[in-house]
């Protein structure tokens, strides 16, 4: 039976006919044209509507619940009357994260309904635990379920970010400049410099990456190097890359340690994609709570309340993102209408993991191409010439319970290589990592590490060991070293103590040993700042040479308003030095940090070293670049000066802007049109960024969704009305540069007194400007907001006559008193009031 829309007349008849739905059947009173269904008399008009077919809402109802206040709409049903038999034509389910979910069996039964008839009680049984009940009086359909028919609303562990918000060609260029000068003791000097450039040009999700550097700029030894030239498309959970790649762009899943330096021209394809976001912050074992009605779920650990969350009726997974990491038990309390309905203990399993996280699907990449191997040398003993070779391989990673693993198999230069990496947490206190490599030329490598947090939480311990043996083909060196270290937090034993750290490194291949021991204690912390004590010793021995020992002790004083001061002594190279350091930080301005240090030998033989050394530095954050300037005079007499600066440029069409930030290779250009030093703020995913002047560029991380809101700056006296373009939602891929062009009006609150040309006051007059209106008081005084672009006030009188006040607001900010102003074009206010005219706005 085809479905038709109700005509207005039929809707009226239907509404009128609904009155009769509540009339109990009575043979003596029933209309001969009425029909009875399920004990309800159906008027002729409503019967006709049912024959045409109609949609009714579908609600889920928990069996045994009183009332319908906790019912949730989960879809709609199309019902129709066929030869006196009421049927369901089909069910349309509506998915919602907040709604209860039905079991898969119940869902399949619902979706399979096609022209299913209701019985005399207007019910359709689905399973032993679920049935459909139709109420003609309320004109709604209920899915009545027992708890066994409910599914569980689980939280998504992955999500695609979707299509790019930027549909035109755009580009981001990041730059990093470094200049170094070394002044020698004999008066000579040498200077070196570099400029690194990374450009990403994109069209929607497609982008091309160029990465290279210039060296020795301005010198006779200028050189350049191109490191990457790559096309990439990472979309909907799959990534393709091709061109001149580095090993990270070729594959990023498993270890790949046997590849030597060189250039790779190849392709890569797989599902290791940044366009799919995996949430590894949830518990690997879901924490589930059942609520018979809308209520709260409380999570408690050792008597401490960790979380309170609200849910509707049904089985729900509790959000564990905000819970501490580790493996532990929590008490789950379900509270409905202020009463504890249930209480039980569940296990939380949250562990730090590499890659996608526990429970993510298998990740894979296949890759290959041509490999140009650079010339290789090992301490002048082994040398291998540059060589061309093929390269092909595959990588994969995944997890099994708490075990995370990754594997890579590849071949080049007629050699086959296999590598694996395993990470296994043992409880919440021990973490084991193993990485192995095996090649067909008998090369092998094994790296293992164990880290542990000892009971009580006051100490930790770590152990690392690496052993590598290389055959006659791979371009790597042997290795044999081990390290052990730990940290002891004595503060947990006694509040007056601090933290003690120790480490030992042993490189058995080169017969070198390195010991360190450090102690830090907070001596004072209060209103006037904090005082800390640092002390330590280091001892280094390389081969048969004499051991080199260094010692230090220092007091660090941190003062309010970003001030820091340190004083101490160090002993190294056979003499003792006194050291002073100071630092000042600024929240605003171009210079953000300035610092200086001074050292003087106070005992021992300095030999050829100078007795006095020191340096100074400044960190800056300007509109188009940020970086550091450092000048240092070392004990050996050399004076070293270096400058580093970095920034970004964004481009889209006719829009181009620069920034001193390098947060990512995507971004947003804001064309605010603000004059002079006007300032507003952009709130992006909760973070506040200042916007100054007419145009700003803000680099952002790629593969992200952003909610952007423009607002007035709390650091500015100016007030702005952001008429349009206040809020935006963006999805950015590498190289995407979005352009936001809001309509911004700079507002000034103007107050003053308005007069006619003869000096008479315009009392109780309605005056207007570009954005609003107001009325003067009996003294001709007024207060109104004015758009600085249109600094005029006008007054209309005698029908179509107008006088106008031109305001001088170029230097005005926030609020201004303009004093007496003249409305040019009005000779006298008295003439207006004598005519008795009602002045108009």
Swiss-Prot record:
Listed InterPro entries: CarboxyPept-like_regulatory, Pilus_assem_C, Pilus_assem_E-set-like_dom
One Pfam family named in its UniProt record: TcfC
Keywords on record: Fimbrium biogenesis, Signal, Transport
Source organism superkingdom: Bacteria
Induction pattern: Negatively regulated by H-NS. Positively regulated by IHF and EcpR.
Signal peptide: 1-29
Membrane-crossing segments per the record: none
Miscellaneous comment in the UniProt entry for this protein: Not expressed under classical laboratory conditions, but is functional when constitutively expressed.
Function according to Swiss-Prot or TrEMBL: Part of the ecpRABCDE operon, which encodes the E.coli common pilus (ECP). ECP is found in both commensal and pathogenic strains and plays a dual role in early-stage biofilm development and host cell recognition.
The family this protein is said to belong to: Belongs to the EcpC/MatD family.
Name of the protein in its database record: Probable outer membrane usher protein EcpC
Organism: Escherichia coli (strain K12)
């Amino acid at each position: 039976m085809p479905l038709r829309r109700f005509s207005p007349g039929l809707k009226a008849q239907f509404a009128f006919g609904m009155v009769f739905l509540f009339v109990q059947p009575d043979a003596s009173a029933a209309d001969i044209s009425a029909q009875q269904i399920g004990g309800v008399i159906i008027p002729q008009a409503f019967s006709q509507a049912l024959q045409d077919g109609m949609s009714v809402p579908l609600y889920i109802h928990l069996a045994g619940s009183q009332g319908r206040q906790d019912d949730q709409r989960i879809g709609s049903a199309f019902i129709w009357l066929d030869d006196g038999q009421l049927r369901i034509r089909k069910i349309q389910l509506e998915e919602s994260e907040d709604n209860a979910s039905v079991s898969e069996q119940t869902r399949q039964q619902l979706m399979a309904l096609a022209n299913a008839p209701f019985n005399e009680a207007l019910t359709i049984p689905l399973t032993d635990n679920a049935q459909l009940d139709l109420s003609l009086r309320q004109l709604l359909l209920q899915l009545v379920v027992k708890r066994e028919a409910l599914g569980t609303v689980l939280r998504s562990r992955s999500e695609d970010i979707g299509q790019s918000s930027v549909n035109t060609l755009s580009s981001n260029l990041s730059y990093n400049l470094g200049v170094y000068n070394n002044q020698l003791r004999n008066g000579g000097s040498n200077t070196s410099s570099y400029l690194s450039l990374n450009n990403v040009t994109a069209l929607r999700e497609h982008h091309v990456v160029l990465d290279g550097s210039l060296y020795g700029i301005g010198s006779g030894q200028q050189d350049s190097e191109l490191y990457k030239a790559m096309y990439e498309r990472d979309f909907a959970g799959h990534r393709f890359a091709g061109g001149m790649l580095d090993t990270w762009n070729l594959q990023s899943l498993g270890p790949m340690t046997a590849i030597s330096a060189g250039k790779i021209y190849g392709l890569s394809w797989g599902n290791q994609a940044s366009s799919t976001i995996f949430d590894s912050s949830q518990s690997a074992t879901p924490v589930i709570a059942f609520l018979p009605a809308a209520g709260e779920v409380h999570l408690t650990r050792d008597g401490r309340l960790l979380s309170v969350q609200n849910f509707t009726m049904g089985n729900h997974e509790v959000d564990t993102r905000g819970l501490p990491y580790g493996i532990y038990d929590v008490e789950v309390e379900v509270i409905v209408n202020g009463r504890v309905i249930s209480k039980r203990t569940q296990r939380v399993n949250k562990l730090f993991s590499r890659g996608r996280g526990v429970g993510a699907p298998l990740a894979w990449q296949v890759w290959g191409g041509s490999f140009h191997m650079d010339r290789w040398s090992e301490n002048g003993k082994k040398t291998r010439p540059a060589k061309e070779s093929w390269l092909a391989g595959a990588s994969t990673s995944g997890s099994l319970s708490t075990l995370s693993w990754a594997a890579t198999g590849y071949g080049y230069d007629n050699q086959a290589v296999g590598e694996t990496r395993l990470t296994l947490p043992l409880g919440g206190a021990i973490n084991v990592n193993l990485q192995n490599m095996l090649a067909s030329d008998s090369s092998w490598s094994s790296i293992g590490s164990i880290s542990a947090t000892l009971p009580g939480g006051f100490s930790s311990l770590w152990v690392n060991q690496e052993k590598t043996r290389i055959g006659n083909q791979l371009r790597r060196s042997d290795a044999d070293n081990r390290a052990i270290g730990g940290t002891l937090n004595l503060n947990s034993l006694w509040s007056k103590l601090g933290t003690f750290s120790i480490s030992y490194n042993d490189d058995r291949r080169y017969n070198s040993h390195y010991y360190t021991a450090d102690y830090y204690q907070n001596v004072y912390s209060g209103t006037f700042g904090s005082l800390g004590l640092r002390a330590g010793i280091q001892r280094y021995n390389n081969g048969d040479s004499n051991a080199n020992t260094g010692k230090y002790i220092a007091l660090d004083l941190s003062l309010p308003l970003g001030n820091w001061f340190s004083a101490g002594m160090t002993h190294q190279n056979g003499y003792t030095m006194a050291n002073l350091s100071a630092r000042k930080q600024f929240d605003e301005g171009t210079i953000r940090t300035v610092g200086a240090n001074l050292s003087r030998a106070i005992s021992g033989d300095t030999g050829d070293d100078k007795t006095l050394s020191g340096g100074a530095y400044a960190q800056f954050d300007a509109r188009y670049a940020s970086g550091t300037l450092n000048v240092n005079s070392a004990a050996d007499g050399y004076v070293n000066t270096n400058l580093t600066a970095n920034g970004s440029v964004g481009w889209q069409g006719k829009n181009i802007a620069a920034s001193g930030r390098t947060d990512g290779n995507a971004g947003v250009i804001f064309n605010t049109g603000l004059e002079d030093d006007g300032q507003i703020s952009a709130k992006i995913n909760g973070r506040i960024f200042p916007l100054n002047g007419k145009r700003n560029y803000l680099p952002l991380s790629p593969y992200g969704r952003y909610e952007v809101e423009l607002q007035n700056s709390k650091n500015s006296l100016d007030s702005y009305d952001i008429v349009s373009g206040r809020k935006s939602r963006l999805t950015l891929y590498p190289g995407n540069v979005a352009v936001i062009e809001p309509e911004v009006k700079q507002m000034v609150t103007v107050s003053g007194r308005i007069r006619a040309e003869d000096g008479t006051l315009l009392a109780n007059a309605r005056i207007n400007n570009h954005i609003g209106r107001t009325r003067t008081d009996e003294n001709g005084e007024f207060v109104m907001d004015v758009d600085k672009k249109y600094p005029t006030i006008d007054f209309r009188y005698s029908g179509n006559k107008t006088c106008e006040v031109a305001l001088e607001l170029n230097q005005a900010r926030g609020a201004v008193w303009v004093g007496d102003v003249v409305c040019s074009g009005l000779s006298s206010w008295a003439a207006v009031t004598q005519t008795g005219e009602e002045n108009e706005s």
